[in-house]
């Protein structure tokens, strides 16, 4: 190995060149390899941008449009709110001496309130209060209490 390192290129010649100008002269044109690397540098940036423009950007746009359409679909198909809104038309100047009763004029009987937990014939004080302490202690544990129980 020392023999190879100690040997000089002068022993073997200048590899077929007629003069030694190539040692002292400045380089003229870049080598073919460096020219190819330069074009690869330009094409590599184009190769970096191409997957973004062809794959990632359209996929992102389609995903955004899908979420937008899903949001609009759910918004249009959402059920109406559960509360019932009604309006009362009151006269601006009621006749003098006449007492107007507003509640009988409302159409309570025509509408059932589906969100009410009470049965239609139940009133709050009569059926849905818990039994008194005396009634609860008098009844045996096996009997049904007379309080508010869901009707099936």
Curated annotation (Swiss-Prot):
Q: What's a single GO CC term here?
A: membrane
**Compartments where located:** Membrane
Indicate yes or no for the key word Lyase. Answer: no
Which ranges does the record mark as transmembrane? 52-72
**How would you describe this protein's topology in the membrane?**
Single-pass membrane protein
What keywords are assigned to this protein?
Answer: Membrane, Transmembrane, Transmembrane helix
Region feature Disordered, mapped onto this chain: 117-152
What is this protein's record name? Small integral membrane protein 28
Q: Which organism is it from?
A: Homo sapiens
The top of its lineage is:
Eukaryota, Metazoa, Chordata, Craniata, Vertebrata
């Amino acid at each position: 190995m020392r023999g190879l390192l100690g040997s000089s290129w002068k022993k073997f010649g200048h590899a077929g060149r007629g003069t030694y100008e190539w040692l002292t002269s400045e380089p003229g044109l870049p080598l073919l390899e460096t020219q190819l690397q330069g074009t690869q540098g330009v094409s590599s940036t184009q190769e970096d941008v191409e997957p973004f423009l062809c794959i990632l950007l359209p996929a992102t746009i389609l995903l955004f449009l899908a979420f937008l359409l899903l949001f609009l679909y759910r918004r249009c198909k959402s059920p109406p709110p559960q509360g019932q809104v009604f309006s009362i038309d009151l006269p601006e100047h009621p006749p003098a001496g006449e007492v107007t009763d507003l509640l009988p004029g409302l159409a309570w009987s025509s509408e059932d309130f589906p969100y009410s937990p009470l049965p239609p014939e139940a009133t709050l004080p009569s059926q849905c209060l818990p039994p008194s302490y005396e009634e609860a202690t008098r009844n045996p544990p096996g009997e049904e209490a007379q309080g508010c129980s869901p009707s099936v």
